[in-house]
């Protein structure tokens, strides 16, 4: 297979402490690259890059089958229970430039627990961090990934019903990112079927941007 038949997709996950960033990254990769555990404080203290195996024939482009590889940058939660604001910003900025400085970023995922209300300053902190590090145009390359989506099913809510009850803060954010969002269930985290559906959704977002990347240089 030639290089023209291969595509590398660069993703980064951001969000509050215990939002499920590392677990979501593992689902995207299809492997347990990132350490994830329940804890009363922040678990991830430094950025880490994970790479998936090649997904052969995942999509077609120009009449040819394309082999896809996913790269995910896991970032510390923000605000962080152990690291200062300055340390988190420096760590994430350094990692973004190191890993994606030449190739650019296809999509930045704001990870938000579906069972935690999104409003107030704490909810806005991660969004502000993303804008500060990625620039004013970052919302053109941003999507919201809701974790713990199994809570919707237990509450008898569809995704549409959930969003109708969402806070104005969340609805405004979704409007600003052209309603790019994904729901991720915690049941069977590494389930390949769920992973493929999420990757297909992500590729839809990337196609909407005509495969352009957010420049970090």
Curated annotation (Swiss-Prot):
* All copies of domain AIG1-type G, residue ranges: 6-217
> What is this protein's record name?
GTPase IMAP family member GIMD1
Where GTP binds, per the record, is at 15-23, 36, 148-150
Q: Which PANTHER family match?
A: GTPASE IMAP FAMILY MEMBER GIMD1, GTPASE, IMAP FAMILY MEMBER-RELATED
Give the species.
Mus musculus (Mouse)
Q: Which GO terms describe its molecular function?
A: GTP binding
Task: Give the family per the record.
Answer: Belongs to the TRAFAC class TrmE-Era-EngA-EngB-Septin-like GTPase superfamily. AIG1/Toc34/Toc159-like paraseptin GTPase family. IAN subfamily.
Q: Which gene encodes it?
A: Gimd1
InterPro entries under this entry?
Answer: G_AIG1 (IPR006703), GIMA/IAN/Toc (IPR045058), P-loop_NTPase (IPR027417)
**What Pfam family is a match for this entry?**
AIG1
What keywords tag this UniProt record? GTP-binding, Nucleotide-binding
């Amino acid at each position: 297979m030639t290089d023209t038949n291969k595509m590398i997709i660069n993703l980064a996950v951001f969000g509050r402490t215990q939002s499920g960033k590392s677990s979501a990254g593992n689902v995207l990769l299809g492997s347990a690259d990132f350490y994830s555990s329940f804890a009363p404080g922040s678990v991830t203290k430094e950025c880490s890059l994970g790479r998936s195996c090649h997904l052969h024939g995942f999509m077609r482009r120009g009449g040819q089958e394309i082999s896809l590889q996913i790269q995910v940058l896991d970032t510390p939660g923000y605000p962080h229970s152990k690291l200062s604001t300055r340390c988190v910003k420096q760590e994430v900025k350094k990692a973004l430039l190191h890993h994606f400085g030449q190739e650019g970023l296809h999509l930045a995922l704001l990870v938000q627990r579906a069972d935690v209300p999104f409003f107030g300053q704490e909810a806005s902190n991660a969004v502000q961090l993303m804008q500060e590090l990625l620039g004013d145009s970052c919302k053109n390359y941003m999507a919201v990934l809701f974790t713990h989506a199994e809570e919707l099913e237990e509450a008898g809510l569809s995704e549409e019903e959930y969003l109708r009850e969402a806070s104005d803060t969340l609805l405004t954010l979704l409007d600003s990112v052209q309603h790019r969002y994904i729901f991720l269930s915690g049941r069977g985290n590494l389930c390949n079927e769920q992973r493929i559906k999420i990757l297909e959704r992500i590729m839809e977002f990337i196609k909407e941007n005509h495969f352009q990347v957010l420049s970090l240089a």
